[in-house]
Every structure is written in C-alpha cells, then in structure tokens.
C-alpha cells in the first residue's frame, strides 16, 4: 500500500512539474511585438521590422517565421511570401533569441501584410501568432 501511495504521489508531482516547465507561456505575447514597414524614399524597396515593444521580448530564431506581403494596386512586388531565410536577425546575445527580425523586399508602392512568429521572454516562449503591418 505504501508503494502504491508513493507511486501515485510521485506521478502527481511529475505531472505538476512538467506542466510548470512548459515551453509555451501563459503570459500574452501578442501585444508585445510590433511589425513596422517602410517604403524607401526611392520607391524601390520596402523594409519590414519585427521587434519586441520592450527589451524583455525577443523574436524566436528557431521558429520558421514567415510573412505574406501584398502591394497597392498597380505596384510591382519582388516576392509575396517571405521566409525566415529571407530575413536578418539582430542577435540578442541569448541562445535562440533575437532583438529583431528584418526583411527587405523589392516594392515600388506601399505594402501591407502579416507575419507569423513566436516571441519569447527570458523564461518562456509563445505559441505562433500573427502580427500585421502597413507601410507608408
């Protein structure tokens, strides 16, 4: 009987411990990441920057971030789908985390779109979510 009780208690502890060290966070990350897009003055390319609103929010470098981009009517867009490999990360000095992720795409008119990413704090990461952007 003591062995059965000990096994039950140990099992309950293991379940509790594993749920508290989950890789995804209970804290909301969606409002802590911004996406900024800007068309250059020459009207030849657009830059999209994804970053945390504060220094404690990071972009997860291990998640395959991707963006869907559309251009204003009559405009020319170099690429409508951007992947992680198309971007450049600004390293945060923490394994798997970046301060920002920047994409550059050829565009001659304003762009809009959304990016699917994972954000992290020092202790946890979000589930994948989308952020939207619109350039000048």
Map each language-model feature to its residues.
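Extracellular/lumen-exposed scaffold segments
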Residues: 24-136
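Bacterial Sec-dependent N-terminal signal peptides
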Residues: 2-3
